[in-house]
C-alpha cells in the first residue's frame, strides 16, 4: 500500500520542486504553467498523459488555451505520496517550453 508522506518527507521532497506550491485546505501540490500557444500546452499535456498512464497515477488538471493548471495528490492515500513527487519531477522535465514565471 502507498503511504502518505510524513511532514519531514514532504518538506525534503518539495525542496527539489520549487515551482510547486501547497494547495490550501488539501494535502496536495499545484503548479501553473503557461506556454506560447495551445499547441504547446496540448503537446505538454500529451507527454504527461502518457507518463501518467504508465504510472497509473493521473493528475487533476485544467487547460485554457496556453495555460495548464496541475494538482497532484494520491486519492488512495488521502494525500501526497512518492507517486506525486515522481510525477511532479516528470512534469517539470516535460515543461521545457513553459514560460518563466508562469
Swiss-Prot record:
Coiled-coil regions listed: none
Pfam families registered for this protein in UniProt: Pterin_4a
GO molecular function annotation: 4-alpha-hydroxytetrahydrobiopterin dehydratase activity
GO process terms (BP): tetrahydrobiopterin biosynthetic process
UniProt xrefs under InterPro entries: PCD_sf, Pterin_deHydtase
Enzyme Commission (EC) number: 4.2.1.96
Keywords of this entry: Lyase
Catalytic reaction(s) noted: (4aS,6R)-4a-hydroxy-L-erythro-5,6,7,8-tetrahydrobiopterin = (6R)-L-erythro-6,7-dihydrobiopterin + H2O
Root EC class: lyase
HAMAP family, A to Z: Pterin_4_alpha
Recorded family membership: Belongs to the pterin-4-alpha-carbinolamine dehydratase family.
NCBIfam families registered for this protein in UniProt: PRK00823.1-2 (NF002017), PRK00823.1-3 (NF002018), PRK00823.1-5 (NF002020)
Protein name per UniProt: Putative pterin-4-alpha-carbinolamine dehydratase
Organism: Burkholderia cenocepacia (strain ATCC BAA-245 / DSM 16553 / LMG 16656 / NCTC 13227 / J2315 / CF5610)
Organism phylogeny: Bacteria, Pseudomonadati, Pseudomonadota, Betaproteobacteria, Burkholderiales
